[in-house]
Amino acid sequence: MTNLRKTHPLIKIXNHSFIDLPXPSFISTXXNFGSLLGVCLVLQIITGLFLAMHYTADTTTAFSSVTHICRDVNYGWLIRYAHANGASMFFIFLYFHIGRGLYYGSYTFMETWNIGVILLFTVMATAFMGYVLPWGQMSFWGATVITNLLSAIPYIGPTLVEWIWGGFSVDKATLTRFFAFHFILPFIITAMVMIHLLFLHESGSNNPSGLNSDSDKIPFHPYYTIKDILGLLLMSLTLLMLILFSPDLLGDPDNYSPANPLNTPPHIKPEWYFLFAYAILRSIPNKLGGVLTLVLSILILMMFPVLHTAKQRSMTFRPMSQCLLWILVANLIILTWIGGQPVEYPFITIGQLASISYFCIILILMPITSLMENHLLKW
């Protein structure tokens, strides 16, 4: 009798994706982040669903409904903090996953890479809208500032902003539609993740050497399922430590004050995972220029396949490029720090220098370094 998992139309798909999938025999731990992102997405959808059962998307009751979840709902505090800190874990893994892609040259899988960048934009939009929902001070003012950026678009800007707000300011209509979008987007993200995997399985996985590994493949199960479970255990431990010991470590104290349109917080800033982009936005004195630079700072990821001048795919055997990539990582950490600082003398200059160096490293230094390495290797 033939095996059901190999013949059943539905189970067959799962079998070809997670069980009998031929994978390179020597991919590093860095390749674990994809599966962890999948787990994070499922966690976010489940916790979000339970939160939505108790949350009310109305300006008068949104803040108190979140308080009610934390105080009165069975394990509501756990669900709420798992959702909030789960989002932080999601972004940590997203950035690691992108970094891994840059290090090993995975961006040469054009379709997989491009849908990945679109996924990043979608996840960022979802996280931003989720941050607005508790209707605290930072939620309200964050929503006001970020949506207001669209007014920089010539001609249609102001009309577009009012259309998104559903009025002349961030109010009940804005909160209701943000809740609707925040609810539907994770399911769209799930569909896009499936397309992401579909494109990946068309070409097969990359590996640290960057060479073709068709001659040396092993089944995904049990080798990589066990490896993924190890990553899952480490993630669960970290997330539980965060939720149970310091749930508000990555949050903003201002969000424990209900939204007040008459009182602006001294420093408006988004969640920590957007700070690098926020720092780039603030470092440009012009509004439209800042918005364009903000979009380009993420969109530039799509340029990597075009900017790849090296004869080798991976950075494993390219020490100079490795060095530059780590400088880029340090630069992004500096930008994240600057994004959380007030707009004052030393921070403005540091932010501007870090923003310029961010674009210079990617657009100029990395391609030139790759060409130099080609020359040194006599290629």
Swiss-Prot record:
The keyword Transferase does not apply. It comes from the Eukaryota. One of its GO terms (cellular component) is mitochondrial inner membrane. Heme b b566 binds at H97, H196. The keyword Transport applies. Heme b b562 binds at H83, H182. PANTHER family: CYTOCHROME B (PTHR19271:SF16). This is Cytochrome b.
